[in-house]
């Protein structure tokens, strides 16, 4: 197999999760980094950039057509936005594109796979407490657990997994590969349902599990 090296990365969804990826990869001068946007949003992102942790980053801004056959596509949309983005994903993904979905919910990988085929997808989950303030997105790089990813089946230490590790290495992004990527996705889903739902009902903040004797 040819040695894989990721030289171009597209981020679809430049919100809380996408910001973590942009923040990390913006420092890599050996890759092309772009955010996917069209029309008025493309103009705005090109003009204003992405404000993250008090600094403004200016990744390139690509239409789905301009991003066609990118090496690595990271989908970090809000769950409800996925159906409307499937056509964009189809346009972006070429025969050598790998796709990582960093979305909540357990079926985003399946929904994307229906469009482009499962072989393009590297299952993953992200754990980052990122929130929006007036001056953009904020998170603590030190305490962020980061991105957990791995192949659906052996060989787990695939060319693609090695290429993604190499991409993230030294960027500040926290990451690890695992043989249990699918279980990790379910585990996060369970956490969201079992922790965040009661929290939402009670109107309590994320820290309440550590602080309150009632939770």
Describe these PLM feature segments.
Residues 4-58:
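NAD(P)+-binding Rossmann beta1-loop-alpha1 motif at the extreme N-terminus of oxidoreductases
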């Amino acid at each position: 197999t040819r040695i894989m090296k990721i030289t171009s990365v597209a981020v679809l969804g430049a919100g809380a999760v996408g910001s973590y990826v942009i923040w990390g990869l913006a420092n890599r001068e050996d890759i092309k980094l772009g955010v996917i946007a069209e029309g008025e949003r493309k103009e705005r992102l090109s003009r204003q950039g992405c404000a993250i942790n008090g600094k403004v980053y200016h990744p390139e801004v690509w239409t789905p057509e301009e991003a066609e056959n990118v090496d690595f596509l990271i989908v970090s949309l809000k769950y409800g936005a996925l159906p409307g983005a499937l056509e964009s994903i189809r346009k972006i993904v070429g025969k050598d594109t790998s796709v990582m979905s960093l979305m909540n919910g357990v079926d985003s990988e399946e929904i994307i796979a229906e469009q482009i085929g499962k072989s393009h997808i590297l299952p993953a989950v992200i754990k980052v407490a990122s929130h929006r303030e007036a001056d953009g997105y904020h998170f603590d790089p030190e305490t962020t657990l980061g991105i957990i990813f791995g192949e659906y089946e052996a060989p787990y230490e695939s060319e693609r997994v090695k290429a993604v590790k190499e991409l993230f290495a030294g960027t500040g992004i926290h990451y690890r590969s695992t043989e249990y990527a699918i279980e990790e996705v379910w585990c996060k889903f369970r956490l969201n349902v079992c922790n965040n739902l009661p929290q939402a009902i009670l109107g309590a903040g994320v820290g309440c599990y550590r602080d309150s004797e009632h939770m």
